[in-house]
Curated annotation (Swiss-Prot):
Keyword DNA damage carried by entry: no
Protein family membership: Belongs to the UPF0756 family.
Superkingdom in the source lineage: Bacteria
UniProt-recorded name of the protein: UPF0756 membrane protein GTNG_2661
Record keywords: Cell membrane, Membrane, Transmembrane, Transmembrane helix
Localization (cell): Cell membrane
InterPro entries: UPF0756_TM
GO cellular component, as recorded: plasma membrane
Regions crossing the membrane: 5-25, 53-73, 86-106, 116-136
Main location: membrane
Membrane association type: Multi-pass membrane protein
Length: 151
């Protein structure tokens, strides 16, 4: 057994112990790709474009209430009348700008990716975190909203 498979199996065990379905599914997909000998064809594309695909799926999920009619112009205009909505808007902009800096950092120092991956795996598997950047903005906005409500 080679090192990548052993590493993935270790992470799978952590995912099972932590009962983290997303981590388990992700590792199962990667192990299946390796098992069927598709890694040379699929993994470079997943590595290069996977984050963008994930953000696209999350964006579709976030926009689904617009498509179903749950959120329309009336709700949008109404929401912008609250301080919470303005905080969320500002943090959406802030996180997008921070992500730009993160992309530049990873491009200039690819070795930092290993630490990033390890930190993400630890957060996802042990602390039930979510490996999704845009949700960080919502989390920060939530904290600030609670602080504004408190004071």
């Amino acid at each position: 057994m080679n090192e990548p498979v052993l590493f993935l199996l270790l992470l799978l065990a952590i995912g099972v112990i932590a009962k983290n379905q997303s981590l388990i599914i992700a590792i199962a997909v990667l192990l299946a790709i390796k098992l069927f000998g598709l890694e040379a064809r699929l993994l470079p594309a997943i590595q290069a474009k996977g984050i963008n695909w994930g953000v696209t799926v999350i964006t579709v999920a976030v926009l689904a209430p617009i498509a179903t009619g749950e959120i329309g112009f009336k709700q949008l205009i109404g929401s912008l009348q609250s301080a919470s909505a303005w905080i969320a808007l500002l943090f959406g902009i802030f996180v997008a700008l921070i992500a730009k800096g993160g992309v530049m950092l990873l491009a200039s120092d690819p070795h930092i990716t290993a630490s990033l991956v390890l930190g993400t795996v630890i957060a996802v598997s042990l602390f039930h975190g979510v490996a999704v950047g845009p949700l960080i903005g919502a989390g920060i906005a939530y904290v600030v909203i609670k602080m504004v409500e408190y004071f």
